[in-house]
Amino acid sequence: MGLAARTGRFFFTEVPVADHFPLKLVGSRMLAPSVRHLEFARDDGQALDFIAGQFIQVHFNNPDGSPTKRSYSLATQHDHAFGVNDTVEIAVSFVPGGAASALFTALDEGQQIQCSGPYGRFCLNDKDQNARYLLIGTGTGVTPYRAMLPQLKQMMDTRGVEVVLLFGSRTEEDLIYREDFYAFAAENPKFRFMPCFSREVPANATADARRGYVQEQLAELVPNGAHDIAYLCGNPNMVDASFEALKEFGLSVHHIRREKYVSSK
């Protein structure tokens, strides 16, 4: 069961965990050379409400018939309780030879997958009194941050919180949902989008682009345990390194919220 507090249009919401339910593919597009954005409609007449930051599990069988599952953060932006006609979105990384990759490669529009959820507590909390959020992610680990944008906007508008998103990527084409983050930054002065490239910084990059790994940029932001709360999502090595660095800057463990993405075939 997921539980999170929301203010204004975001209410105290309890999202029940259902048994397996069908999701029907209604659309897809490539976000990066190896990442696909998939849009689904729940196909049993029920709504799939969730709290930004939560994930679903996809259940399927391996080639040998044994059951398995994969977890995917929900990417959909919403500021209302979901209805039966609302769709949900996920971002799927394709791994050569992966069982889940084979499942999604073969999935055509109109076909179903079996899912459960939503699960997870990697969510924003309106009881926070911080002055700034540091959102740190790599790869598809920025998916929950996309879902959080409406709630972050409300927090920026109502209590003036500042938000910095550090997004680690090899190249610009690997920056999934970059159009959403660039547009959100342009519309909201309190939101700063800092793409961090492990390879060369593109010639047309914004002034906030950086060269190197996300954890190497933390010193520039001068994290402060008195007013910062950090979220870490993505590669386990990045999460661990950033966690240790943030503790050294004085953030308490309570103010560092983590979710690791482990690639599974």
Feature annotation, model-predicted:
Residues D126-A131, N224-H227:
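Short helix-loop-beta connector
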Residues R132-I136, Y231:
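Conserved beta-strand elements of the Class I
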Residues L3-E109, S198:
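Ferredoxin-reductase
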Residues P118-D128:
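A short, basic/flexible loop-to-alpha-helix module at the beginning of a structural domain
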Residues P144-M156:
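Histidine-anchored nucleotide/phosphate-binding helix
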Residues G2-L3, G8-F10, P16-P22, V163-K265:
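Reductase modules of NAD(P)H-dependent flavoproteins
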Residues T138-T143:
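Ser/Thr-glycine-rich phosphate-binding loops at phosphate-binding pockets of nucleotides
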